[in-house]
Amino acid sequence: MGAPNDTVIFLRRGKIERREDAFRIGKSKYSAVRTTGIIIAGGAQITTQAVRLALRNEVPIVYLGGNRILGVTVPFSERYATLRLKQYEIASQPSARLAFARPLIASSILARAAVLEFLANETGITGLEDAADEVRSEAERALNAGSTDALRGYEGRAACRYFRALAEVLPDWAFSGRRTRRPPRDPFNAAISFGYAGVLLPVLLSRTVAAGLEPFLGFLHGPRGRRPGLILDLMEEWRALAVDVPVLRRFLDGSLSREMFRWKGDAVLLRDLDAVSAPVLTVLSRVRGGLLEAVDRRIREVRDGVSRQSPPEPLEFDPEDVGVVWDALEV
C-alpha cells in the first residue's frame, strides 16, 4: 500500500474506517476527496461508515477474492441509463464492435513498441530497435483490420514478437520468451499475470463502472461468464506501461528475485504479491503528469465515443512516456 496521498487505496490486510471526511487505515489517513478508488483484497475489511463515506464521495469499491472480482460498490445513480442503452446497441452490431476494438488494440501495440524502443536506448542491446519496428508495423494493420479474427491475429503477432524481445533483457531464470498463463510457467509470467488480473483489472473496473459503462459488454472481448469484456478491452492499452514496465524494472534492479517465486510442477507462483502490486500502484498514482489521470481521460473518451456512436482515436506512446514510468520507480 502506498503513502496517504495515493489516489487508489489497495488494501490486503487491516481495516478501513471513517475518521471525519477521511478514510483511516491504522495511523494513516486518506482524504475522501483525493481517493478515486478502493480495492479490498485478502483479509482486509472496511466498515459500513467508511462505505457510506465512499458512496457520498462517488468512490467505487472493488472486492477481490484471490484474483477474482467478487463485487463492486458504486453510488446509486440514474445518470447513465441512456449511455448503457447505446453501449448495448454497439454490442449487438459486430461491425460497430470491430470499429471500437481497432483503436484499442492499435494503442496496445504502439505501447509495446515504445517499451522496446526505450529498452533499446536504455540497455544498448542489439536487435531491440528492429523488434520495436516489427511490433509497430502491426498497429497500422490493426487499425484497418477487416474482421475480429484478423485483428486478433495482428495483436497476437505483435505480442509474440514483443515478449520474445523482452527475453533479451530479462535474466534467463526469469523468463522463457513466451507469454504463458493458466498456469504461468516462469517468474516474469507469474508477476505480470498477477499485475494484470490482481491490480490493473480491479483499478480499471472501479473507474469504468464509476464512468457509467457496463463492464461486461466489451468490443473485442464479448460477454462470457464472469469475464468483464470491456475492462479486458481497456486493459490492452495499459498493460505495457502500467504492469510490464514496473515488473521489468524490479527484475532488473533485483527487487524481484528468484526467492520470491515458488515452482510447483509446471506452474510458477508469486510468493510476495506486494512486490508487484506496490510498483504497479506507484506508476499509476505517482507518475509525473498522472498515468491514472491518462487512464481516466481514456475511459471518458471511450464513454463519449459510445455516447456519440463514434470510436475514439488510438493513443500514441513514445519512449519518453516509458522513461517517465521507469524513472518513477527509482529505488
Swiss-Prot record:
Pfam families according to UniProt: Cas_Cas1
Annotated binding of Mn(2+), by residue: 155, 221, 236
UniProt keyword terms in alphabetical order: Antiviral defense, DNA-binding, Endonuclease, Hydrolase, Magnesium, Manganese, Metal-binding, Nuclease
UniProt GO MF annotations: DNA binding; endonuclease activity; metal ion binding
Gene3D superfamilies (UniProt xref): CRISPR-associated endonuclease Cas1, C-terminal domain, CRISPR-associated endonuclease Cas1, N-terminal domain
Annotated InterPro entries: Cas1, CRISPR-assoc_Cas1, CRISPR-assoc_Cas1_C, CRISPR-assoc_Cas1_N
EC numbers on record: 3.1.-.-
One GO BP: maintenance of CRISPR repeat elements
TM regions (residue ranges): none
Cofactor: Mg(2+); Mn(2+)
Similarity remark: Belongs to the CRISPR-associated endonuclease Cas1 family.
Quaternary structure note: Homodimer, forms a heterotetramer with a Cas2 homodimer.
UniProt function note: CRISPR (clustered regularly interspaced short palindromic repeat), is an adaptive immune system that provides protection against mobile genetic elements (viruses, transposable elements and conjugative plasmids). CRISPR clusters contain spacers, sequences complementary to antecedent mobile elements, and target invading nucleic acids. CRISPR clusters are transcribed and processed into CRISPR RNA (crRNA). Acts as a dsDNA endonuclease. Involved in the integration of spacer DNA into the CRISPR cassette.
NCBIfam families associated with the record: cas1
Name of the molecule in the record: CRISPR-associated endonuclease Cas1
The organism of origin for this protein: Methanopyrus kandleri (strain AV19 / DSM 6324 / JCM 9639 / NBRC 100938)
Lineage of source species: Archaea, Methanobacteriati, Methanobacteriota, Methanomada group, Methanopyri
Gene (name only): cas1
